[in-house]
């Protein structure tokens, strides 16, 4: 194994450790909260921006409205996440929650590594290095990356269909 393999293992292990500490429920709610924040900010900023009459530039008003909605949604999500996390601890499900959290964290780590490997391969010369070709773990991620791009090509209007 080369240093790239150890870095891959470290990313997956760190993601798993974070999820072990936080638990599945908190990790999943955090992910949902971020998705909701993007949704709320992108769909409702026009309703809030009309209240920022102190700013003449529409771009500034919209930017402030997006930021306010995004941050407010994250705050509300954090409060909900905290309350539900406390509920999970009080019900005695924290052991199961943490085991599921490790699984969630490992999956997230694998997806993060796949994304990093894709960008390193596509936009840098790292993929031409000797360590890249000697890596035992990098070939294992080609399946994930290939499946993702096959899905994108079949579902995206931006990419030509095969």
Swiss-Prot record:
Function: Required for colicin V production from plasmid IncFI ColV3-K30.
Periplasmic side: 53-63, 120-162
One Pfam family this sequence matches: Colicin_V
Keywords of the record: Cell inner membrane, Cell membrane, Membrane, Transmembrane, Transmembrane helix
GO cellular component: plasma membrane
Organism: Escherichia coli (strain K12)
UniProt-recorded name of the protein: Colicin V production protein
Predominant place of localization: membrane
Record-annotated membrane-spanning stretches: 1-21, 32-52, 64-84, 99-119
UniProt key word Membrane: yes
Presence of the UniProt keyword Cell inner membrane in the record: yes
Subcellular location per the Swiss-Prot or TrEMBL entry: Cell inner membrane
Membrane topology qualifier: Multi-pass membrane protein
GO biological process: toxin biosynthetic process
Side Cytoplasmic, residues: 22-31, 85-98
